[in-house]
Regions:
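Hydrophobic alpha-helical membrane-association signature
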Residues: 28-32, 70-73, 103, 176, ...
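Terminal peptide-recognition signature
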Residues: 13, 17, 31-32, 49, ...
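Crotonase-fold acyl-CoA enzyme core
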Residues: 80-195, 225, 230-233, 239
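Conserved CoA-thioester-binding segment of acyl-CoA-metabolizing enzymes
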Residues: 1-52, 79
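Helix-loop "lid/cap" segments that line or gate small-molecule binding pockets
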Residues: 149-150, 161, 201-205, 217-223
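Glycine- (often His-adjacent) and acidic-residue-rich active-site loop
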Residues: 51-81, 96, 126
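Short C-terminal tail/terminal secondary-structure segment
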Residues: 240-246
Length: 246
């Protein structure tokens, strides 16, 4: 489910659930957390995360999304990628939706194909992302694009993501992983203590990614709402949801 490959000081981690477009469940999160912990313990210089079968990650597996343990594991993974002492890179093709976009913005560097798709479609289901994601996304793309993605459930192609700064580099279809590993090799040759210090400074410049009382209230209201149940039911029944704001 989670494949790892060492290439010198670069570690490639691949989410391998192509039948689910690499949607995350508990096992996938456990595997990713284990791969990250092993990279930290092994002295890896750059960690590259990608997905198998033409997709990065299509989000959370909706059979586990309501589980508090899943949410806690996902946050641990995102924060671990953000705060790892070495640079982390997302190599994105196909769908990077919901938790897929969260994984991407947790990484320091992002490379994608022009046809990749980024988005946070929580509003289509009655879900709500945490304050960590809202803050990190806004820092990556700016308030205007973040509001379009979060309030209007708009998606960004890889090409558009490159234009707005969500993606740093583009790679041709079929050459993504090779391009990502080539870039990672370049990054791995730089001074690791300089990189570690720069990450600390950049992360501190983002400010507190924790919960404010107002956001926690709004978040918990969304997650305990009838609209959430309606959104999940509509998804399972493959029909449009009928949200009532309650």
């Amino acid at each position: 489910m989670i494949l790892t490959e060492s290439r010198g000081s670069v570690r490639l981690v691949t989410i391998d659930r192509p039948e689910r477009r690499n949607a995350l469940d508990h096992d996938a999160l456990d595997g990713l957390l284990g791969a990250l912990a092993d990279a930290v313990a092994s002295g890896v210089r750059v960690l590259v995360v990608t997905g198998a079968g033409g997709h990065f990650c299509a989000g959370a597996d909706l059979s586990t999304v309501e589980d508090e343990g899943f949410v806690a594991k996902l946050h641990e993974l995102l924060e671990g990628l953000r705060t790892a002492r070495f640079p982390t890179m997302a190599a994105v093709d196909g769908a990077a939706l919901g938790a897929g976009t969260q994984l991407a913005v947790a990484c320091d560097l992002r490379i994608a194909t022009p046809g990749a798709t980024f988005g946070i479609p929580a509003g289509r289901l009655g879900l709500m992302t945490d304050q960590w994601t809202v803050t990190r996304l806004a820092a990556a793309v700016g308030q205007s694009v973040a509001r379009a993605m979060l309030l209007a459930a708009e998606t960004c192609s890889g090409e558009r993501a490159h234009q707005v700064g969500l993606v740093t580099r583009l790679a041709p279809p079929g050459e993504l992983v090779a391009a990502a590993l080539g870039w990672a090799d370049e990054v791995a040759k730089l001074a690791p203590l300089t990189q570690a210090a720069a990450k600390v400074g950049l992360n501190e410049a983002e400010g507190d990614l924790g919960w404010t009382p107002a956001f926690r209230h709004a978040f918990e209201r969304a997650w305990s709402s009838a609209d959430l149940q309606e959104g999940l039911a509509a998804f399972a029944e493959r029909r449009p949801p009928d949200f009532e704001g309650r």
